[in-house]
Amino acid sequence: MASSTDVRPKITLACEVCKHRNYITKKNRRNDPDRLELKKFCPNCGKHQAHRETR
């Protein structure tokens, strides 16, 4: 079972513009303690937008 203090937890990335949750990925908590933000393609908007980690 995954504990709440997992080093590489699963996170969901949501589009900043339309708020759709498009991507699921893992991140390293030691390297990225704050929220992750990546520029990825949003199929709902039809272009590359900033995607941010949701809780």
Swiss-Prot record:
GO annotation, biological process? translation
Which GO MF term does the entry hold, naming one? structural constituent of ribosome
Per the record's keyword annotation, is Ribosomal protein included, yes or no? yes
Q: Name one GO cellular component term.
A: ribonucleoprotein complex
What SUPFAM superfamilies does this protein's entry cite?
Zn-binding ribosomal proteins
Q: Which family does it belong to?
A: Belongs to the bacterial ribosomal protein bL33 family.
Q: What is this protein called?
A: Large ribosomal subunit protein bL33A
